[in-house]
């Protein structure tokens, strides 16, 4: 009877798909002329940085700019057709008196996150750092007169947290920026567009960011999709990517273009979806062989929105992190800081609670790759050397079949308690028997192969 049960379970498990490791290393579809063409050759340092990035597994995204003052999200300028000259006046009142880079980085580090990605300049066009190439920045245009990016970069380096810079290819406030499908109601004159001027401006700012702020682990681009209505538009990415890799060869480049990676990119990102899913309609691209990252918000918006108190539970956030790791991806979880410079109280509490969980189970996340067993409805697996970590997130039974083929299980224990777990060899895998139906946020079984 047990053999029949195991055989049935093996068939069901195999029908669910291939392993997460194989899925993460596969490609599908026909490459376009802009897809990876093997022209870019990363340095050894860059390859090492990619591996370190994959080991990190968990980062925090911070969307902060003038839009926080209006408390209606980071797209409020275009969503409400705010005139670019009137919007710019917000800078004169931006004074985040409670901002403390030390408190931010400390709270984020306590969560178990290994890196921070900060919006140096979002679509609104306001630079959160002191730039020579525009007066529209935190030091020259606001009474605050402090370089937010500098303080944050210094604190990240001090506390050993990785530093990633978000940089938008869009600017709803610059007259020379190309008009795309967003920001059309901000009043910018069409005749003022000057792509060469705007492109040079962006490269000049990127040079500042990669020269004046110490080691930068990644540049996170956004906005390519603003010109998807104009297929002939050339963002001149190869030249821009080459500049970045020249200034800091180990700096990783990712682009939120919702397509397969382009030549010169070092990791692939997915927005509001896990790799292989497309519930939000933004992540239909095939999974590449590059390191993977999925970004999601802790509540509903990226930037601060006063009415958005729909924060995900700690359990949901942990499950998102675990599901990402089981699909060979990092999780970049977003928080929108308040206009006074504080991280929202609920967000800080979530960070603390995630950190408590990571203190116990971090070993099953950090440094792992997608496991031997593909993701299932019950959960996922992660793997490190000969150790397979079975993350049981949703199981209404005391038994679980793992399709690991002919691999021999040398030992199986409850990761947290180190108590032995019963296993039975079956056709095509092994059957795990638990003492009771798991009710933990994440029941982790460690299997030594």
Where do the protein language model's features map onto the residues?
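Bacterial N-terminal signal peptides
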Residues: 7-16
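General helical structural elements
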Residues: 6-7, 276
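Positively charged n-region of N-terminal signal peptides that target proteins for export
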Residues: 1-4, 108
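Mature catalytic domains of secreted/periplasmic carbohydrate-active enzymes
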Residues: 21-449
